[in-house]
């Protein structure tokens, strides 16, 4: 790649970082995450993983620090891998609201890049890919999952859905060598929700 192309990528990534930070602006203004339907459940999961990471347990199956300390075997039945960024941010900031906001920003940044990549692969048009990534990442459904319902599993699954859809399209209609997109997209969705 030449210098001009690297510069273009750099500016696009800076733009995506700014957009990801704008996504969490309502949280920054109000200072808290709205308590949606699943707030307590997901907050406890994030706190549990954060506590386990602090104590050197990187694969928590039995939840003993949260959920009233009853020894809930939640880690064995509900995917926790995609919650690691939230838990790492929790350990870095020690505030669950800030951790969730930073986690949202992290995954919106990932979504912007994934949607940009698959749209650009399909249509070979960078402007269309950028616009599509913004429209998708700031869609009403994703905003509702984050700021109204606190449906973290659905939010995370929606981040990887475009990759799975592109992979499905590529395998069945266009480019069979792009099967890893389907595998990655579906695996990430399964690990999300």
Regions found by a protein language model. Give the residues of each.
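Membrane-interface junctions at the ends of membrane-embedded or membrane-associated helices
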Residues: 1-8, 122-124, 170-180
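Active-site lumenal/periplasmic loops and adjacent helix-entry segments of GT-C-fold
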Residues: 25-122, 126-160, 167, 188-192
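Start-transfer (signal-anchor) and selected internal transmembrane alpha helices
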Residues: 1-27
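Membrane-interface transmembrane helices that cradle and orient dolichyl/undecaprenyl
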Residues: 162-180, 186-189
